[in-house]
Amino acid sequence: MHQSHSILTVCFVASLLIVAIIERPSQGAEPVPVMNKDRAAAFARLALKGLGKEYPNKLDHVLSGPADVKSPLALHPVFYGSYDWHSSVHGHWMLVRLLRLFPDMIEATEIRHVLGGHLTAENVTAEVAYFGRKESKPFERPYGWAWLLKLAEELNGWDDPDGKVWAKNLRPLADIVVSRYLEFFPKQTYPIRTGVHPNTAFGLTFAHDYGQSVGDARLVRLVDERARAYFGADADAPAGWEPSGADFFSPTLIEADLMRRVLPSGEFPTWLSRFLPGAAKGQPHSLFEPATVTDRTDPQLVHLDGLNLSRAWCMRSIASALPADDPARGALELAAARHSHAGLEHVASGDYAGEHWLASFAVYLLTTAPAK
């Protein structure tokens, strides 16, 4: 009984910590919270708690025979923690991002220890070998691919001795992921428009960012071409059907967030007005109001906390890509603020179902500059 009481107390205090450092909305426009060292520390501790935690673990692993029955650590010596491979990847990304922003944070030494222990050349070689299995062709496509490239992008842009070593070590895995993009997406005739991991628009979005950051013209051309082919003629998005019960992306908004990267600045507002004609009026209502989460211990229902966070970053960036006098801009900015507060309040719920991944979405929201 005493141990259970202690665990509940720790979870409650962790939840209060996150909530206490998020500004409450004002009576008028709600300012989107900004990152500071206290928030960074709270988010980092959530990731540090999970990245070395091998179990519980949800493997995406195809067995070709008895010899393929292995532990998560044996299969994925870098990305074995945080419940699943992709959550481990974006947990690593989050720690790198926070360390870059707050190099003197109290958790910095522990963060460097964890990253240095995981991102070794030997460990990455094993991850590359896993991708080389015939059965692993569709492994983590495209959600995990996208986050792996985001991690590589973060490391590549960091002028730090450790960061340079880790970037070099990770490069072979980033290269094989890029090759998977170049091989697969020309064959995918139709986009996947779901609000979860297979979403095509999200997969292309982070690939576009990576391609631009490293000067990979082939990858950028591929994303531009496929985005236009998949989404260029879209109109009247059925956004009133959103959200689905386990979404962590809005199919409508994540598509628009991709297209504001791909289309020239003069074309995007016209495309958006055709695609989401009710945006200036905050319609449809179900898209512009935060989703309701009824059970944060359920690994599917808690996805909706992530939806609120990803909607916020999409709305903010979409709004910033519009002219100052565009009538949709204000509605999107207000909705982004509402979604930010709704999502950030529940990053630390006390349950691993959300805590193993939501902090990464929160950090992406709070540390990624809106489009200009």
What feature does the model see in each segment?
Residues 1-6:
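N-terminal secretory signal peptides that target proteins for export/translocation
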Residues 9-20:
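Bacterial N-terminal signal peptides
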Residues 18-31:
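Bacterial Sec-dependent signal peptides at the C-terminal "C-region" and cleavage site
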Residues 30-80:
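Low-complexity, Ser/Thr/Pro/Gly-enriched N-terminal "stalk/linker" regions
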Residues 31-37, 73-89, 129-146, 187-200, ...:
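Solvent-exposed loop and edge beta-strand segments that line ligand/cofactor-binding
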Residues 31-35, 45, 49, 89-105, ...:
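Well-ordered alpha-helical scaffold segments within catalytic/enzyme domains
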Residues 74-77, 89, 98-211:
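Extended ligand-binding groove/face enriched in aromatic
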Residues 212-353:
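Long, repeat-rich segments with strong aromatic
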